[in-house]
């Protein structure tokens, strides 16, 4: 975040940004910052060839969390979330990213920043697939066989009894 962006946001959201202006200047100016939907936009708008986040690129428009939720499928209630990292989790006005194993990455506000939280600790009501992300089904790694030198040698079988 630079001075120009902060000034734009102060005009755009005076009641939300203005009360935190000093904190933002002291802690976030000169660094990367994101609100909840900004985490998703930052990933979707990222240009790997330049290393930049290019506004409204890669097919994703500049939308808010509720618009994204209301305009996509598949989605479901939070109790049906599949174990797919990268899904979004949502409740009205807020969105986070499910990273698997019951964990979420979310932007929790100006003073807290971006944090990892437990899925069960949030007020999440639904999950969605983000249409600008390609989900790849993971295949489990095959188990490696036990090395031969660690196997116990088998006892030799007793000889067959000899008949007279």
Regions found by a protein language model. Give the residues of each.
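Aromatic- and glycine-rich peptidoglycan recognition patches
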Residues: 49-83, 92-159
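Loop/turn positions that initiate beta-strands
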Residues: 85-87
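N-terminal capping segments
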Residues: 1-52, 92-94, 105-107
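Long, low-complexity repeat tracts used as extracellular stalks/passenger repeats
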Residues: 161-164
């Amino acid at each position: 975040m630079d001075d120009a962006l902060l000034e734009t946001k102060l005009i755009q959201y005076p009641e939300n940004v203005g009360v935190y202006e000093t904190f933002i200047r002291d802690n976030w100016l000169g660094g990367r910052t994101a609100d909840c939907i900004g985490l998703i936009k930052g990933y979707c708008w990222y240009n790997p060839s330049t290393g930049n986040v290019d506004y409204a690129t890669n097919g994703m428009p500049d939308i808010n969390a509720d618009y994204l939720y209301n305009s996509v499928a598949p989605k479901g209630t939070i109790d049906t979330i599949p174990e797919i990292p990268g899904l979004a989790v949502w409740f009205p006005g807020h969105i986070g990213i499910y990273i698997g194993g019951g964990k979420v990455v979310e932007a929790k506000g100006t003073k807290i920043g971006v944090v990892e939280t437990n899925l069960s600790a949030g007020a999440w009501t639904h999950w969605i697939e983000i249409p600008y992300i390609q989900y790849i089904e993971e295949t489990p790694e095959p188990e490696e066989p036990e090395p031969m030198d660690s196997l116990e040698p088998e006892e030799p079988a007793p000889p067959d009894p000899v008949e007279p």
